[in-house]
């Protein structure tokens, strides 16, 4: 089978909930990163075999949002596109599918990634289709129902984090310390310009005057301390330890990579940023969905023939501090190699885009450090994990 390589990788800066990107639909965010991939490589858009993008909150987004993004990006109408939903793992599963297509010879060039605008997720009214003859009607928040609610146990994702905190004996103090460190690392990375090369600026229309460029993650909070986080009330259980401060946030953004067969990249004279060494998915108990990266990581490492100790860098999505700490405890990885520029607790978690966002951040940090082996992994609502390893030979 053919080696699959990444020749370009980019993301938008992550917008806060109801923040700078709130009015820009997910397909437009996706289109922006696709255009940037083509600009960076000089690739003729007609050479793209398919576009595969994750998006979780598709209600009200129109037919096949990935197709919308592809057309808006200027790809020819003959280039097909697919939207996939694997909840938080969608953006990374898109790379799995793209790599599979290339490895088996079905494609040579794939755009893969994810897009999400949580700010625009609509409220829906169940039952209205068949008529509301009398009485009150109920509005359902599609963002919570389709993105943040466990369909098996009928509770919020935050309860799954509480379950892990209880199972692993994780204290509120440990979780707050983890969250504060994530914020501090992210602020240091932003101030040091470490995200600059991976971010595609977005032009945000204004009511008056020219559009404003948006190129800096706006979720991280400078000056966050453990003491400040300790003042927050539990968000999901009265006697719980998971708060808004030690959990990821609601966000908007997009990310994408350009995948090619190694032979195609060589023929086009494009430099290879990294090779996809392996990828894997796994299922776990939905009640402790956050532990999903453990089995997914072990499977991916086994496929690559690597040990955990060989990894130079790891990007593990921080859905919750409790979840991240539980995964770290199970795998026993070196925390100094994990999310070195902060994670989703600070940077944000636009759910359909996050899988590719962590991959893009991993890749650019590997380039910056000349790292050879890296891992991207995420937990997934409903009880799954997803992982992918990168090699820079």
UniProtKB/Swiss-Prot annotation:
UniProt xrefs under InterPro entries: Thiolase, Thiolase-like, Thiolase_acyl_enz_int_AS, Thiolase_AS, Thiolase_C, Thiolase_CS, Thiolase_N
GO molecular function: acetyl-CoA C-acetyltransferase activity
Listed EC numbers: 2.3.1.9
UniProt entry tagged with the keyword Thylakoid: no
Pathway recorded for this protein: Metabolic intermediate biosynthesis; (R)-mevalonate biosynthesis; (R)-mevalonate from acetyl-CoA: step 1/3
Assigned GO CC terms: cytoplasm
Signal peptide: none
Subcellular location: Cytoplasm
Residues at the active site: 88 (acyl-thioester intermediate), 349 (proton acceptor), 379 (proton acceptor)
Pfam families found in the cross-reference section: Thiolase_C (PF02803), Thiolase_N (PF00108)
Catalytic activity: 2 acetyl-CoA = acetoacetyl-CoA + CoA
Record-level GO BP terms: fatty acid metabolic process
UniProt keyword terms in alphabetical order: Acyltransferase, Cytoplasm, Fatty acid metabolism, Lipid metabolism, Transferase
Keyword Nucleotide-binding belongs to the record: no
Family: Belongs to the thiolase-like superfamily. Thiolase family.
Protein name per UniProt: Acetyl-CoA acetyltransferase
